């Protein structure tokens, strides 16, 4: 790794160092230490000679491999940490209200006024707390006082808490702010129900969906992801305001969240009937814990992939046959299939690993979506 001089103190530092270890100055590389080409601070390798400007991490490795599939030249606009930088900051009620006021001609910002570095989320945590505060008394009412009237509330709150929380995260990250919240709810409720019905129709066909076998588990991934991708595509085709990758992430997440919430409610009820209260409560906790890496993430990838291959063209049927879209849709299918396979690791290690992989893909698409903002500004200026 080459050495460069710190602009602040003049000491020699590694070219990959983000801050000077001597004086703490934030180091922004403007030229490649190897060939001297001018570069952006967001690039991980020199576009001219390929010299590594940053140490490779999981994000870089995933991005490089996904670039080979998509043909994109991704850039790191934000890290996973950046997306949550405002979570624990103090916010006013007015700021909270403004988050949900968007989607109309008056409340949708012009692309030239959007700063991709502003992408962050914080309302999702408040939503999760609301669910938690509502879940506790329903649980007490049913478990401690034996009042069956609390059971429907316990099931619905337990099933909806995490999928809705993750959905709100995607809603906040869509800084185009061009999809009103009522439409997000529409995609969540209708999309979840329609994709479930479509999946049931697929299950009624003569497929091997026995998750005790590897082939059966993989087929479950096919049978459940194709219906979700179909409904996501339907909504994206119908909503002419959806033009960007971040829109695809949001619409996909909404459909996936609806699918996850309704499916989880069914699992909670079924396990409660067959296994009793303790089993039911275990399912609530387990499904909630694993929700961020499941249906919400998988459907979000499908939506983002479709909007990526569209680029700045009007969405067309030809994009559904685009090789890049089809290859990217294999990712959630494989992730889902492996998730259901009879592979046991301690502490649900397999599902945690798959969650991390899914979110590395999502971060990749978030960065492509933020890069698209700069690309859109150039496109509009032509």
How should these model regions be labeled?
Residues 1-64:
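Cys/His-rich metal-coordination motifs, chiefly Zn-binding "fingers/knuckles"
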Residues 45-382:
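Hydrophobic alpha-helical segments at protein termini of multi-pass membrane proteins
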């Amino acid at each position: 790794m080459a050495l460069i001089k710190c602009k602040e103190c003049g000491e020699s530092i590694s070219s990959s160092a983000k801050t000077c270890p001597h004086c703490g100055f934030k180091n922004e590389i403007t030229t490649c230490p190897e060939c001297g080409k001018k570069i952006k601070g967001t690039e991980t390798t020199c576009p001219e000679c390929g010299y590594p400007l940053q140490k490779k991490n999981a994000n870089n490795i995933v991005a490089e491999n996904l670039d080979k599939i998509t043909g994109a030249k991704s850039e790191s606009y934000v890290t996973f940490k950046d997306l949550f930088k405002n979570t624990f900051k103090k916010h006013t009620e007015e700021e909270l209200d403004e988050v949900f006021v968007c989607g109309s001609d008056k409340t949708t910002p012009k692309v030239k006024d959007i700063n991709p570095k502003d992408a962050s989320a914080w309302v999702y945590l408040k939503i999760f707390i609301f669910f938690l505060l509502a879940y506790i008394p329903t649980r007490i009412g049913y478990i401690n006082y034996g009042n069956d009237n609390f059971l429907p509330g316990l099931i619905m709150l337990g099933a909806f808490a995490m999928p809705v929380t993750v959905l709100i995260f995607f809603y906040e990250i869509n800084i185009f702010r061009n999809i009103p919240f009522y439409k997000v709810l529409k995609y969540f409720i209708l999309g979840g129900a329609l994709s479930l019905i479509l999946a049931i129709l697929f299950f009624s066909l003569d497929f091997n969906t026995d998750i005790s076998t590897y082939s059966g588990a993989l087929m479950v991934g096919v049978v459940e992801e194709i219906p979700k991708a179909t409904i996501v595509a339907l909504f994206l085709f119908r909503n002419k305001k959806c033009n960007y990758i971040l829109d695809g992430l949001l619409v996909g997440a909404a459909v996936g969240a609806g699918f996850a919430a309704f499916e989880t409610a069914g699992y909670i009820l079924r396990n409660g009937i067959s296994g009793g209260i303790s089993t039911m409560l275990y399912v609530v906790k387990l499904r909630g814990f694993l929700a961020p890496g499941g249906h919400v993430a998988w459907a979000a990838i499908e939506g983002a992939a479709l909007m990526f291959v569209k680029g700045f063209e009007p969405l067309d049927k030809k994009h559904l046959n685009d090789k890049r879209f089809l290859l990217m849709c294999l990712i959630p299918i494989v992730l889902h299939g492996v998730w259901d396979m009879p592979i046991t690791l301690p502490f649900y290690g397999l599902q945690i690993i798959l969650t991390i992989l899914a979110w590395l893909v999502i971060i990749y698409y978030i960065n492509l979506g933020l890069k698209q903002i700069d690309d859109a500004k150039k496109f509009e200026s032509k």
